[in-house]
Amino acid sequence: MSVVTVQLGQCGNQIGFEVFDALYSDSHCPQGLCSERENEAYQASSKERFFSEEENGVSIARAVLVDMEPKVINQTLSKAAQSGQWKYAQHSCFCQKEGSGNNWAYGYSVHGPRHEESIMNLIQKEVEKCDSLSGFFIIMSMAGGTGSGLGAFVTQNLQDQYSNSLKMNQIIWPYGTGEVIVQNYNSVLTLSHLYRSSDALLVHENDAIHKICAKLMNIKQISFSDINQVLAHQLGSVFQPTYSVEGSCHYRRNPLGDLMENLVPHPEFKMLGIRNIPQMSENSLTYSTFTWAGLLKHLRQMLISNSKMEEGINWQVRPPLPGLPTLGKVSLNRELHFNTSIANLVILRGKDVHSADLGGFKDPALYTSWLEPIDAFNVWKTQRAFSKYEKSAALVSNSQFLLKPLDTIVGKAWNMFASKAYIHQYTKFGIEEEDFLDSFTLLEQVVASYCNL
């Protein structure tokens, strides 16, 4: 089954390019550490998901590119074409000559309705090229204008027109120090609208990815391209094919459906995060060897201590003791910074993958009490290595990992709203104070729900 990717705004288009490039490079990598037959099956499965029929031997990304300024889209198209290996379809883009000026309301209330028909027609054409549709993967920023405002509008339209298809939004959480003065407003409006129309939100925090670039990849002057390549690696490690069941030699057909089934058991809980291990520069990799036991021990501690990378993990954090009453557990977790999960999916790729022991992730103490551990944890595997790593693990988690950043953004936006700061920028384009209040109410409920796990 195929996934149609919708790239929105500068952020969505730049990341989208890196994602397709990473997927293509990995599936055509000669060092897959598996038989030729297995490699061909992996390649065919990846291609069916993300690329359509080839023109003259070049794969075409199953994607629609949307931006209100032409510059980034033109750069993205040309970079893909220059690779000589894959490209975007000739008529898969929509762009205009004016941006949204970091104004969420302008993206949502002006650009959205004005260009709705053109954008939805492009998406429909892409859907018609798929033999069967797994769903939509929408890449966007949370705090800008076009990506976030128009992104929320397009997602809502996808929900209206393709209500039986899954929608997953990959959103970029802004830097804590802030790139845009109204980013907290934009973020609150984006999240609340997506919570109503998307099936899952896959969140990457800019601050966390920046740290990975600095500490693990040893990059001295970090560019957006560096950050986007780390993001693309993480997304590829989740979306590339894995076997359907233990011992099977058939790859999963429905990537989005399988992810949702494993990770989103209730519509109140839609926030997903990714952790990867190992992540390192080519130079460091030359001198490194890994065991599954070592990788999984670190990955489990990254999960429970809410660490985004293996450097600087807090090893003092432990799961609460069984038998503790819920209230005691909640306050103790806050004290210990223990990250309670609803559901976890571990994806293992590489050598001796079937020897990996995942018992540590099946511990009931890691999970909320209302879901059986057998339903809360899943594992996907393939012997086919990913990217440059002989062994690698990805963890997709629905947990309390975003509680603090979400609470902070809602708090900052509320303080600005209480003093009516910048509200006129939104009301003049039809986003009223009532809309803000609805958004605050919804997100405060999300915070409370995750808090009480």
From Swiss-Prot:
Signal peptide: none annotated. It is found in: Nucleus; Cytoplasm; Cytoplasm, Cytoskeleton, Microtubule organizing center, Centrosome, Centriole; Cell projection, Cilium. GO terms for cellular component: centriole; cilium; cytoplasm; cytosol; microtubule; nucleoplasm. Keywords: Cell projection, Cilium biogenesis/degradation, Cytoplasm, Cytoskeleton, Developmental protein, GTP-binding, Microtubule, Nucleotide-binding, Nucleus. GTP binds at residues 143-149. Belongs to the tubulin family. Acts as a positive regulator of hedgehog signaling and regulates ciliary function. This is Tubulin delta chain. It comes from Canis lupus familiaris. The lineage of its organism: Eukaryota, Metazoa, Chordata, Craniata, Vertebrata. The gene is TUBD1.
